[in-house]
Curated annotation (Swiss-Prot):
Keyword annotations of the record: Ribonucleoprotein, Ribosomal protein
Organism in which the protein naturally occurs: Streptococcus suis (strain 98HAH33)
Name of the featured protein: Large ribosomal subunit protein bL34
Gene3D superfamilies tied to this protein: 1.10.287.3980
A GO biological process held by the record: translation
NCBIfam families: rpmH_bact
Gene Ontology molecular functions: structural constituent of ribosome
Domain of life of the source: Bacteria
Coiled-coil annotated residue ranges, if any: none
Length: 45
C-alpha cells in the first residue's frame, strides 16, 4: 500500500496558503484566530 501523504508545494500553497485563506470569510476567521493567539507563522505559503 502506498503512503497517503505525497507532498506537493503547489497543492499545499493553493489549499492552505495566505491568499486562499484571504479568499473566504472562514479563511479570514482562521487568520484572525491565529493572529489573536500570537502565532509567528500564519500560513504555510
Amino acid at each position: 500500500m502506498k503512503r497517503t501523504f505525497q507532498p506537493s508545494k503547489i497543492r499545499r500553497a493553493r489549499k492552505h496558503g495566505f491568499r486562499s485563506r484571504m479568499a473566504t470569510k472562514n479563511g479570514r476567521r482562521v487568520l484572525a484566530a491565529r493572529r489573536r493567539k500570537g502565532r509567528k507563522v500564519l500560513t504555510v505559503a
